[in-house]
């Protein structure tokens, strides 16, 4: 079964896609890529899955936004990944993968079995955001939480 962002591709029918992480199963991916411009945002561990087709960029600008793997301090309009943020709401069970955003940037969660995660309170993440920042916990129900 495709992970949540991959499962949304057939439903939303985007003209282009720019995944910021590992590709998943090649057969599923080939179907999703058909008829779309596919741009891989390269990570820090590899140059991108060149055998799977599409373009491979270290970062991509699209209007006022810049997509890159690792957030850069002081950047504006930035969408990144790398940190695999997770957050825990007191009394609400274990930490969950989370989107984190403020008025300047968005850090995407990781979807996968072996991705781990870094707490939103870790200085590597918290130093990137101005208050108020919001963590949106993923799961069967999105839970927005002020940081």
Predicted regions and their residues:
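Extended recognition/assembly regions associated with phosphoester-bond processing machinery
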Residues: 1-147
């Amino acid at each position: 079964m495709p992970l949540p962002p991959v499962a949304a591709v057939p439903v939303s029918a985007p003209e282009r896609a720019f995944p910021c992480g590992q590709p998943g199963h090649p057969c599923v991916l080939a179907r999703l890529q058909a008829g779309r411009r596919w741009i891989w945002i390269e990570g820090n561990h590899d140059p991108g899955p060149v055998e799977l087709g599409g373009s491979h960029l270290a970062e991509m600008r699209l209007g006022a936004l810049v997509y890159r793997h690792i957030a850069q301090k002081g950047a504006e309009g930035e969408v990144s990944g790398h940190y695999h943020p997770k957050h825990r709401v007191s009394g609400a069970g274990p930490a969950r993968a989370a989107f984190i955003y403020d008025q300047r940037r968005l850090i995407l969660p990781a979807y996968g079995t072996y991705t781990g995660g870094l707490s939103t309170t870790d200085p590597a993440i918290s130093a990137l955001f101005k208050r108020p920042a919001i963590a949106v916990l993923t799961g069967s129900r999105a839970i927005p939480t002020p940081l």
